[in-house]
UniProtKB/Swiss-Prot annotation:
It catalyses: tRNA(n+1) + phosphate = tRNA(n) + a ribonucleoside 5'-diphosphate. Homohexameric ring arranged as a trimer of dimers. It comes from Shewanella sp. (strain W3-18-1). This is Ribonuclease PH. It comes from the Bacteria. InterPro entries: ExoRNase_PH_dom1 (IPR001247), ExoRNase_PH_dom2 (IPR015847), ExoRNase_PH_dom2_sf (IPR036345), PNPase/RNase_PH_dom_sf (IPR027408), Ribosomal_Su5_D2-typ_SF (IPR020568), RNase_PH (IPR050080), RNase_PH_bac-type (IPR002381), RNase_PH_CS (IPR018336). Keywords: Nucleotidyltransferase, RNA-binding, rRNA processing, Transferase, tRNA processing, tRNA-binding. PROSITE patterns: RIBONUCLEASE_PH. Phosphorolytic 3'-5' exoribonuclease that plays an important role in tRNA 3'-end maturation. Removes nucleotide residues following the 3'-CCA terminus of tRNAs; can also add nucleotides to the ends of RNA molecules by using nucleoside diphosphates as substrates, but this may not be physiologically important. Probably plays a role in initiation of 16S rRNA degradation (leading to ribosome degradation) during starvation. Phosphate binds at R86, G124, T125, R126. The keyword RNA-binding applies. Transmembrane segments: none annotated. The keyword Cell membrane does not apply. SUPFAM superfamilies: Ribonuclease PH domain 2-like, Ribosomal protein S5 domain 2-like.
Length: 237
């Protein structure tokens, strides 16, 4: 039995609120149960130096957690003077995932920076960030098209992400913190709206997992991501 009484395949209630802030070209509050992340997309003309003159754009991401997003306060990374390895890993994951769904040539020499700020953490912050960031990205691209900065839609497809794992010997989807911290296997999966895999991060925390369990976890992730994409589409419509 899961602590929340959810079935193994059941995700937490998922909410996506668009236009959550006033200034960003795209802004979304995404909620996976008690995990809440603010995702903003900022569109700027021009690209990093390494891409100048190549006729293509760039999408990148930054990730951070507010000091009291967790049970006890943690120092801001800015106050410590450097980002943790975890933060760097997560923001690179978010950036890679988002670049997979954008036609960089159609974006032109423009840059979109996605900022994912965790307001409240209860497991799955990186997968919630990717899910919300995709919707914020869509809004930023639509803003640029409306302004005539880009001519065609660079979005190739929607993407979403979910955590899956083995908890007390059972494969489950969308782990909350109490499950994540005790899981035998923890995995983050990013997929397209049609179920193609963009990235898998999987670790055996307590017990090695079998090939059969891997396939079961990927099946759980695929079904959950299909449901999450439906939430994205409903928000965008």
């Amino acid at each position: 039995m899961r602590p929340s009484n959810r079935t193994p395949a059941q995700t937490r209630p998922i909410t996506i609120t668009r236009q959550f802030t006033a200034h960003a070209e795209g802004s979304v509050l995404v909620e996976f149960g008690e995990t809440k992340v603010l995702c903003t997309a900022s569109f700027t003309e021009g690209v990093p130096r390494f891409l100048k003159g190549q006729g293509q754009g760039w999408v990148t991401a930054e990730y951070g957690m507010l000091p009291r997003s967790t049970h006890s306060r943690m120092d801001r990374e800015a106050a410590r003077g450097k980002q943790s390895g975890r933060t760097q890993e997560i923001q690179r994951l978010i950036g890679r995932a988002l670049r997979a769904c954008v036609d960089m040539k159609a974006l032109g020499e423009n840059t979109i920076v996605i900022d994912c700020d965790v307001i409240q953490a209860d497991g799955g912050t990186r997968t919630a960030s990717i899910t919300g960031a995709c919707v914020a990205l869509v809004d930023a691209l639509n803003w640029a098209r409306g302004k005539g900065i880009i001519k065609s839609n660079p979005l190739k497809f929607l993407i979403a992400a979910v955590s899956v794992g083995i908890y007390k010997g059972e494969a489950i989807s969308d782990l909350e913190y109490i499950e994540d911290s005790a899981a035998e296997t923890d995995m983050n999966v990013v997929m397209t709206e049609t179920g193609k895999i963009i990235e898998i991060q999987g670790t055996a925390e307590g017990e090695p997992f079998t090939h059969e369990e891997l396939i079961e976890l990927l099946g759980l992730a695929k079904n959950s991501i299909r449901e999450i994409v439906d939430v994205q589409k409903a928000a965008l419509n």
